């Protein structure tokens, strides 16, 4: 198995380093990751400037100022030859649950892999301690994919409780929960009197029902949520069509 591994925490983050070590026990791994933390970069792609890469002695490649999407795009299209069988993103320091997937660079890297035609996993740890647990879970799922390919065309968003491996209760297939909108903005002033703003923490959970990713992780289970790239709201197409007609939108411009 050939694995392209990326993240959004940066190439030196403990999550990606731990996962690379575990994956290299049974797979060919090419790490292509940002040279610094790019958390919250979502699906952004660098189009207005060039991208510089740096290779380490072990073959890992850092992309200067690159986004997670940049890294996977470069990895698939030029940096990993032969190309990958699967794209893996993580291990993220902290969860990507519910609405987090909208902003997550970890999920975005996996989404880019899927967009380019590859099976893709996004892996996050609900904390900052038990990276070995998340790595072991990821390896188990990848071995399962090797034995029995999953042909859903979906991204698997995997969230792992921050627990020792022997305390993990199992795996649940879940849906994304949701949070209340985040609305906290923290103002500060720099020494010159200019106003600075920090975006505050995410909102509290508002939908954490028993079938959600929030509930699974809180109860000690690994959450596996299938995600898809197609954002079309098919069930709303007829509703929007009817609304346009009733509202009398004139297409004779």
Curated annotation (Swiss-Prot):
Record note on cofactor: Binds 1 divalent metal cation per subunit.
Chain positions recorded as a divalent metal cation binding sites: 8-9, 39, 92
Entries under Gene3D superfamilies matching the protein: Survival protein SurE-like phosphatase/nucleotidase
Cofactor(s) essential for the protein: a divalent metal cation
SUPFAM superfamilies: SurE-like (SSF64167)
EC numbers on record: 3.1.3.5, 3.1.3.6, 3.6.1.11
GO molecular function (one): 3'-nucleotidase activity
Entry superkingdom: Bacteria
InterPro entries: SurE, SurE-like_Pase/nucleotidase, SurE-like_sf
Keywords: Cytoplasm, Hydrolase, Metal-binding, Nucleotide-binding
GO cellular component terms listed in the entry, alphabetical order: cytoplasm
TM region(s), chain numbering: none
Primary localisation category: cytoplasm
Localization: Cytoplasm
Catalytic reactions on record: a ribonucleoside 5'-phosphate + H2O = a ribonucleoside + phosphate; a ribonucleoside 3'-phosphate + H2O = a ribonucleoside + phosphate; [phosphate](n) + H2O = [phosphate](n-1) + phosphate + H(+)
Free-text function comment from the UniProt entry: Nucleotidase with a broad substrate specificity as it can dephosphorylate various ribo- and deoxyribonucleoside 5'-monophosphates and ribonucleoside 3'-monophosphates with highest affinity to 3'-AMP. Also hydrolyzes polyphosphate (exopolyphosphatase activity) with the preference for short-chain-length substrates (P20-25). Might be involved in the regulation of dNTP and NTP pools, and in the turnover of 3'-mononucleotides produced by numerous intracellular RNases (T1, T2, and F) during the degradation of various RNAs.
Family per record: Belongs to the SurE nucleotidase family.
Name of the protein: 5'/3'-nucleotidase SurE
């Amino acid at each position: 198995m050939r694995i392209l591994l990326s993240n959004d925490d940066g190439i030196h983050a403990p999550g990606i380093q731990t996962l690379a070590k575990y994956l290299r026990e049974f797979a060919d791994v090419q790490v292509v990751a940002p040279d610094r933390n790019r958390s919250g970069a979502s699906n952004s792609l660098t189009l207005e400037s060039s991208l510089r890469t740096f290779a380490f002695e072990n073959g890992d490649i850092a992309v200067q100022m690159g986004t997670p999407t940049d890294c996977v795009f470069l990895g698939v299209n030029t940096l990993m030859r032969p190309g990958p069988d699967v794209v893996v993103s993580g291990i993220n320091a902290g969860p990507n649950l519910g609405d987090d997937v909208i902003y997550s660079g970890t999920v975005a890297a996996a989404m880019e892999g899927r967009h380019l035609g590859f099976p893709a996993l996004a892996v996050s740890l609900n904390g900052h301690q038990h990276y070995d647990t998340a790595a072991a879970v990821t390896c188990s799922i990848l071995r399962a994919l090797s034995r029995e390919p999953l042909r859903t065309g979906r991204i698997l968003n995997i969230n792992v409780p921050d627990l020792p491996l022997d305390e993990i209760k199992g795996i649940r297939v879940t849906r994304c929960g949701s949070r209340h909108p985040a609305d906290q903005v923290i103002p500060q002033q720099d020494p010159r009197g200019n106003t600075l703003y920090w975006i505050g923490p995410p909102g509290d959970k508002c939908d954490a029902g028993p079938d959600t990713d929030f509930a699974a992780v809180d109860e000690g289970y690994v959450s596996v949520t299938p995600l898809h790239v197609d954002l079309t709201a098919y069930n709303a197409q007829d509703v929007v069509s009817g609304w346009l007609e009733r509202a009398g939108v004139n297409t004779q411009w």
